[in-house]
């Protein structure tokens, strides 16, 4: 895994560092403290780290194999979203992340009822942002291992995801890597099927087109060549007349 940046500006994957023919961009959104960063790090590194610094919106990258194809995955972590008297409160970074992404992971914690209640508004934000096209969205319920402090019933997640027409996964970032990997990997597979595949020789074709003017072409005869050829022809005629 590679941390591309931790600034609020979202940059494209540097082309020089990305030999893959496909780049998948995923934004992870949700309320504060639901475990977004833990999910991202768990998926990309298999590790779980319990303590994190305040989420500043890091952009992570990793190359993986999907159906035999090398794919570059960019995962944009985002600051937590809250609800205030005026509705959904999120930073410009969250909005830009959604607009930038090819797919979105919405996360809530089963221990936080408020994080579950704002999912509907988050889904509306995503669909409004991508009103011109439909992008893959999945709903992830995190912290499934904390049964003793559960505040969202197990049946509520699937019901909500069905209403929003998106896939649902209940996971524990701290205890089960396979659950987390399954959710993200399935999303990447579905997204890869939707994206047109770039031909392997596409880059080389462009390069060849750019280099084509460098191919040597026959030179037009200059004045020195013309004079030299004229003298050769003239000398040949003189020799012919002399021999006669």
From Swiss-Prot:
It catalyses: GTP + H2O = GDP + phosphate + H(+). It comes from the Eukaryota. GO terms for biological process: mesendoderm development. SUPFAM superfamilies: P-loop containing nucleoside triphosphate hydrolases. It holds the Pfam family Ras. Keywords: GTP-binding, Hydrolase, Nucleotide-binding. Residues 200-222 are annotated as: Disordered. InterPro entries: P-loop_NTPase, Ras-related_GTPase, Small_GTP-bd, Small_GTPase. This is Ras-like protein family member 11B.
């Amino acid at each position: 895994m590679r941390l591309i940046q931790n600034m609020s500006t979202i940059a494209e994957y540097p082309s020089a560092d990305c030999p893959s023919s496909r780049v998948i961009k995923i934004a992870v959104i949700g309320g504060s403290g639901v475990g977004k960063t833990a999910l991202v790090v768990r998926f990309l590194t298999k590790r779980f780290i319990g303590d994190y610094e305040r989420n500043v919106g890091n952009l992570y990258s990793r190359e993986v194999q999907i159906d035999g194809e090398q794919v570059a995955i960019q995962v944009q972590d985002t600051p937590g979203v809250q609800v205030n008297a005026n509705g959904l409160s999120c930073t410009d970074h969250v909005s830009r992340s959604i607009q930038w992404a090819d797919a979105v992971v919405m996360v809530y914690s089963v221990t936080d009822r408020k994080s579950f209640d704002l999912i509907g508004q988050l889904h509306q934000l995503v669909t409004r942002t991508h009103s011109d096209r439909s992008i893959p969205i999945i709903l992830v319920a995190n912290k499934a291992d904390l049964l003793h402090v559960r505040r969202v019933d197990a049946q509520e997640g699937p019901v909500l995801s069905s209403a929003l027409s998106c896939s649902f996964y209940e996971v524990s970032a701290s205890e089960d890597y396979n659950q987390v990997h399954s959710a993200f990997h399935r999303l990447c597979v579905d997204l890869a099927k939707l994206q047109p595949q770039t031909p392997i020789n596409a880059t080389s074709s462009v390069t060849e087109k750019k280099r084509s003017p460098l191919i040597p072409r026959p030179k037009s005869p200059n004045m020195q060549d013309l004079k030299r050829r004229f003298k050769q022809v003239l000398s040949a005629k003189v020799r012919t007349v002399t021999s006669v």
